[in-house]
């Protein structure tokens, strides 16, 4: 259920793995009961390594930017479109912040712009845990 409307007939088509880290991309189609056809979610193909979270009703992504940096994003489906609502960046020592072994930054874009800095992994929002390695 890609848009979390309770209809389970949604479909993903694997487009392939790309880049040195094998980033996976998919096309996504959701069943529209009004038209009795599938509607394409255009933004889905741009979400790297998507993971559907039924628990948090969102789609999570992860990208290995480099051996010392990861980026994660949270998307929600609104009016048939996927909107990025949060981002998490993880850096390792020697990359951007040489004084730290690891730096984690979390940002939320909806309602209030929440910015959390220098987090320990146990301080990140719970919805990240399916995609962030511990």
Protein language model regions, located:
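Low-complexity, Pro/Ser/Thr- and charge-rich linker/hinge segments at domain boundaries
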Residues: 37-44, 53-56, 85-86
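Acidic/hydrophobic-patterned starts of short beta strands in beta-sheet-rich repeat architectures
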Residues: 2-16, 55-61
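Extracellular C-terminal loop/segment signatures of secreted glycoproteins
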Residues: 24-47
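Acidic, small-residue rich beta-repeat scaffolds with periodic aromatic anchors
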Residues: 56-134
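Residue-level detector of short, conserved catalytic/binding motifs and their immediate flanks
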Residues: 9, 26-27, 73
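Repeated scaffold domains used in trafficking and secretory/extracellular systems
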Residues: 45-51, 94
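Acidic/His-rich structured neighborhood in mature extracellular/periplasmic domains
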Residues: 2, 12-13, 20, 28-29, ...
